[in-house]
Amino acid sequence: MGSIVEPWAAIAENGNANVTAKGSSRELRHGRTAHNMSSSSLRKKSDLRLVQKVPCKTLKNILSNLQEVILGTKLTLLFLAIPLAILANSYNYGRPLIFGLSLIGLTPLAERVSFLTEQLAFYTGPTVGGLLNATCGNATELIIAILALANNKVAVVKYSLLGSILSNLLLVLGTSLFFGGIANIRREQRFDRKQADVNFFLLLMGLLCHLLPLLLKYAATGEVSTSMINKMSLTLSRTSSIVMLIAYIAYLIFQLWTHRQLFEAQQDDDDAYDDEVSVEETPVIGFWSGFAWLVGMTIVIALLSEYVVDTIEDASDSWGLSVSFISIILLPIVGNAAEHAGAIIFAFKNKLDISLGVALGSATQISLFVVPLSVIVAWILGIKMDLNFNILETSSLALAIIITAFTLQDGTSHYMKGLVLLLCYVIIAACFFVDQIPQPNDLDVGLQPMNNLGEVFSA
């Protein structure tokens, strides 16, 4: 029996992981990034007094982990949406209901993935922890994109990724600057522009990679066939995607090695966090336990994401909303609500560097990692997905990047800047709300060649 109990005890090792930390030869610590700090604002300290009275060590460890992972967040009640979504899907209660419950269930899962990657970073060190956070930081968007590609829903992929970038640049950042300015109305809020500048350079590069395939179709003369134009656009997009991934790798090296100090979230001694923001300096769960929970959470995210992809058209028909509006506006708002709330809370506390790190860092990660990776995955699957997001979508992205860059150019902030960003987001949301133009071939704009250049405008 000992050979059976010991592995499970290792996987279920409890929150007293700091004992292992003190006994190890290396100190378990990591640089705190904006994503780590943002997610910590939604955590709450667990009361383990009852759990410690359990006589069985293995059972006590399992209960401790359950309490830390499931009950250690202010979003605990939202976990109820997960079994409800599974039941609704099993008994066919209604596909729009499945879509709504799945969206709600993704919210606490995304926050817990951030928590678990931070816990693993205590053991792996700052570099590997940073890479893990970079990979899992937008796990929901990446999983939805891959599942949508597997179902040949190219437009859903493009819409959802575009919506995530717009949401971070305008909604999250705008809300943070607005409420941060209101809460600190008697003093000017300042932030470090160095990190923002790096992110904007990369976002502009990503925008260039979206513009060129779009402009290529307009630049082609009438002698060039539509199929040839689409082939050139697809080849350019795949080449650009490889370049974007190289740029993202360089960005990770810049962020995690050469210029790490620019991206580490700093804590002020004279402005310490209160009890509402729990910042642990030691791990509360063990490595293998955290890894097992991370794998489990990822599997559940994949399950709910599959529900979202399968039912999005039914929700669109039932609610009278276009798929573009649901994908660009609703998916990012609900799916990343936890991370967004954390950014706003830290802006309230006059910690704009953390809020900017969350919004700009997430937008950069999607633009230079998730988007090109989706193109490469589609290429592997034999699906013709390019970087041409069409004229309306690409214009919205360009204007969002330009407006945000101008807003942050002087390193200071007030509530008026946040209000302008929010209003810009409302205008873009209204645009996609009234846009009821159907897409060809069941939304898969990347699969069907256009008959003439004039159809580019209506695509």
From Swiss-Prot:
Regions of this protein lying in the Cytoplasmic compartment: 1-67, 117-129, 183-195, 260-283, 349-362, 408-417
The protein's name in its UniProt record: Vacuolar cation/proton exchanger 3
Organism: Arabidopsis thaliana
Record comment: activity regulation: Inhibited by excess of Ca(2+).
The UniProt record lists the keyword Transmembrane helix: yes
UniProt topology in membrane: Multi-pass membrane protein
Annotated InterPro entries: CaH_exchang (IPR004713), CAX-like (IPR004798), NaCa_Exmemb (IPR004837), NCX_ion-bd_dom_sf (IPR044880)
Stated induction or repression of this protein's expression: By Ca(2+), Mg(2+) and Na(+).
Keywords, in A-Z order: Antiport, Calcium, Calcium transport, Ion transport, Membrane, Transmembrane, Transmembrane helix, Transport, Vacuole
Gene transcribed to yield this protein: CAX3
Single GO molecular function: calcium:proton antiporter activity
GO cellular component: calcium:proton antiporter complex; plant-type vacuole membrane; vacuolar membrane; vacuole
